[in-house]
Amino acid sequence: MKFRFGEGAEGTLNTSVTTAMIDQEKRAADLKRRKNQMLLFGGATLATLASCRLTARGISSRRYIPKMFQANHMPPQSDMVKEAAMAVVFATTMALSSFSMVVFGVAWSQDVTSLKQFALKMKTKLGAQQIEDEIRNAPMTPETQDLQDQLAGALKKD
């Protein structure tokens, strides 16, 4: 294939070189995207490990260990509201960090980069696209056709 650069200059277009350049750019973008997904998953994993460690430390610090000759059936008085609030905080941080780790892990393994792409993949895997096509291509019932004609007529009058 020949093309002209200007007045009288001719050259040949090497399609294999341009294809290789495009493939290299795609690979670089793919590598960058996968690295970003890996870092998100790693961050969520670190958050999960940190929240588990803080929860374990919080639980062990509240455990009552009696000293020598102390009664073990009557733990000391404590603030129940504070302990309940801390339990909610610990449970929430563990649940959110675990959920984020699962979400980022699934997104990384399934190669999903956005919510729109996730929705499209789920539709294709669950067969929703085929069902939508069947409904779209289904013949209209006479009642539906009559209603559509009435609405079209009412909108044309205005």
UniProtKB/Swiss-Prot annotation:
Family classification: Belongs to the AIM11 family.
Cellular location(s): Membrane
Record protein name field: Altered inheritance of mitochondria protein 11
InterPro entries noted in UniProt: AIM11 (IPR038814)
GO terms under cellular component: membrane
Residue ranges of the region described as Disordered: 136-158
Classification via PANTHER family: ALTERED INHERITANCE OF MITOCHONDRIA PROTEIN 11
Entry keywords, A to Z: Membrane, Transmembrane, Transmembrane helix
Membrane topology: Multi-pass membrane protein
Segments passing through the bilayer: 38-60, 84-106
